[in-house]
Amino acid sequence: PVTEDTPFGKAENPYGATKQTGEILYDQFFRNRPTKSGISLRYFNPAGAHPSALIGESPTQNATNLVPVITETAIGVREQITVFGDDYPSRDGSCVRDYVHVVDLARAHTLAIEHLLQHKNDNRYEVYNLGIGEGVTVLEAIFAFQEATGVQVNYKIGPRRPGDVAAIYADNTRI
């Protein structure tokens, strides 16, 4: 699991590099401004929707995140899902990710703001992981969807994608 104190390694892709750079800049900003404080919330893989459907994933173009890709395949928008790699060191050979519900993310934002407004943060800059703290493989997510809905999802195994890490999930004990 990744803790908030895990040192940054080399980013595997531009998205990861921007996340690292942002945290470094925030840390420097708040360290040098004693009257300011801030919190970074590290999302792992947001998924799901609020029951009202006011927040959640509803891509207007081709989805790239796993849950909407599964959904698009189930309803026939896509012919099939490509599972990128089946030779990772995981339970079934597919990548492992930590999925966190969007309602939990919204609640975490509310709590972070309350924490800052009540001046409860001991440090001027704090980082919190937002994840469930355990990994789910891509194939497990597909099979769970099928079991929950009774809808078969057509998938195929493809080659690994450059930059994909085998497994990443949160150590969420700090939050």
Predicted regions and their residues:
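Conserved sequence/active-site signature of Rossmann-fold short-chain dehydrogenase/reductase
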Residues: P46-A49, L105
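Hydrophobic, Gly/Ser/Ala-rich alpha-helical and linker tracts in large acyl-processing enzymes
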Residues: H50-A63, I70-T73, E79
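C-terminal substrate-binding subdomain of Rossmann-fold SDR/epimerase-dehydratase oxidoreductases
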Residues: T3, V67-I175
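Catalytic helix-loop patch of NAD(P)-dependent Rossmann-fold dehydrogenases
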Residues: P1-N45, L54-N65
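Active-site proximal helix/loop that lines the substrate pocket
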Residues: P7, G48-P51, Y88, G135
